[in-house]
Design a protein with these regions (language model features):
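A glycine-rich beta-turn/hairpin centered on an aromatic-Pro dipeptide
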Residues: 308-352
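ATP-dependent carboxylate/phosphate-activation module, predominantly the ATP-grasp catalytic core
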Residues: 190-260, 264, 271, 278, ...
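Short beta-strand-to-turn element immediately C-terminal to the catalytic PLP-Schiff-base lysine
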Residues: 132, 162-167, 202-204, 272
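A structural supersecondary motif
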Residues: 265, 347-365
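Flexible, glycine/charged-enriched surface loops at secondary-structure junctions
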Residues: 261-267, 316-321, 404-406
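A conserved helix-loop-beta module that forms one wall/lid of the active-site cleft
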Residues: 94-161
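Conserved ATP-binding module of the ATP-grasp superfamily
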Residues: 125-129, 144, 148-151, 163-198, ...
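ATP-binding N-terminal substructure of ATP-dependent carboxylate-amine bond-forming enzymes
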Residues: 1-105, 136, 332, 361-366, ...
Length: 406
């Protein structure tokens, strides 16, 4: 099959999807914003061709590249796995006659207000929400549902541009910070109290072929705002437990409601005093290299299963569930440049056999801000057969390692 893949080399994790497609015999062609010469040699060796355009979200330019490819060969699929690219790819697919995720599905997985309306219509519990473009409308919503409220871009990804307001005064400050006070259209939602996690799937022809559940410790907004916290994301191997059955059942309902056919999915959820509620839905894989955790935990190549699903509408391996797998982010103690680490010898001495991935930027490397994400600075990924033991190990690493900056 001939597959067009958007941004085949950046961010670095994109290369795994290209690798998997090439490994099952697909002819892979790239469309991206970087010059071909900037691609790494391994990715170049796996591409049959490449078109550079100014922006992969600029639909006329993307459509030009796709039609150029179609002039030379039959294009079976146009694939992307990055949130910001999903809607543009869907629009261009429909204009060029290429099968795949529809524009409706892509839009429902991108526009937070429409997404939650579709979930409520399907009977999926979710936060009360609305789209607003004036402070007065936001204040009216807050009076209706009560504080706290969450304000975010309608097309937000992760915690980017997300604010919490606990009072009218804070809501007015948020309105100025996010542009609402100047007429920007944003999504506003009730704050859902509870533990936060996510449900990820590989869905084939509308049926969930394999699935995973991960937990945030602590919840994302707190993790992305608090330097001293070493936040964790942990994938469970206890999918047989009743609570996960409830998540899976709602996940199937979401898949049907949004019209997801063959795609990776990412579904955020909260569990608290009001029960289980689904939040953001993405028609793409999770971020923070989480598929690498699923591969390590399940003793299989999830990227290959995705490639088989895209190219042949099937998968041939399931995760073993032998391990739980988690990542812990280790933040610098201040902004600046890395000077040194303390505690590394201790954790490698204790847990070397559990570690399946890590990154410790060399001294002199500039630090990244806390809000840049879980893998922006130092991190460690580990697996263990027992979920609770893994949590204890991750906690110990967070208490032992210090990333010093100056």
């Amino acid at each position: 099959m001939n597959i067009l893949f958007l941004e085949p080399a950046f961010p670095a994790n994109q290369r795994e999807f290209v690798r998997a497609l090439a490994a099952i015999g697909a002819n892979v062609y790239g469309i991206g914003e970087r010059p071909y010469d900037w691609l790494d040699d391994e990715t170049k060796s796996r591409l049959r061709g490449y078109w550079q355009i100014s922006s992969v979200t600029d639909e006329p330019h993307l459509e030009w590249a796709v039609r150029e490819a179609q002039r030379h060969f039959w294009v079976d699929r146009l694939e992307t796995v990055i949130e910001a690219h999903v809607l543009a790819a869907a629009h261009v697919r429909e204009r060029t006659g290429i099968p795949g995720t529809s524009s409706r599905t892509a839009w429902l997985c991108r526009d937070k207000v429409a997404m939650k309306a579709a979930l409520r219509e399907a009977g999926v519990p979710t936060a009360a929400s609305d789209g607003v473009s004036t402070l007065a409308d936001a204040e009216h919503f807050a009076r209706m549902v009560g504080f706290p409220v969450i304000v975010k871009p309608r097309d937000a990804a992760g915690a980017a541009g997300t604010f919490r307001a606990d009072t009218m005064d804070e809501l007015q400050a948020v309105a100025r910070a996010c542009g609402l006070a100047d007429g920007a259209a944003v999504a506003i939602e009730e704050f859902v109290e509870g533990h936060e996690g996510f449900y990820d799937t590989l869905t084939v022809n509308g049926a969930i072929a394999c699935d995973f559940v991960s937990h945030y410790y602590p919840n994302v907004l707190e993790a992305m705002r608090t330097r001293w916290i070493s936040p964790q994301i942990v994938a469970t191997n206890r999918m047989h437990e009743p609570f996960y059955g409830e998540i899976r059942a709602l996940g199937r309902r979401v898949t049907e409601a949004l019209g997801i056919t063959t795609s990776a999915t990412h579904m955020e959820w909260f569990y608290g005093p009001k029960g289980l509620k689904f939040s953001e839905i993405g028609c793409r894989p999770p971020g923070v290299g989480q598929w690498d955790s699923y591969c390590a935990a399940g003793e299989f190549d999830l990227y290959r299963e995705w490639a088989l699903a895209v190219c042949h509408g099937t998968t041939d391996r399931a995760p073993s569930r032998a391990y739980a797998c988690g990542i812990i982010a280790l933040r610098p103690d201040r902004d600046g440049h890395i000077s040194h680490y303390s505690g590394l010898d201790d954790i490698f001495g204790r847990y070397r056999d559990l570690i399946v991935g890590h990154r410790f930027p060399s001294p002199g490397t500039g630090t990244q801000p806390v809000e840049a994400g879980y893998m922006a600075n130092a991190w460690v990924r580990l697996r263990h057969p027992d979920y609770d033991t893994l949590r204890q190990v991750l906690n110990d690493i967070g208490e032992t390692v210090t990333v010093h900056a100056r």
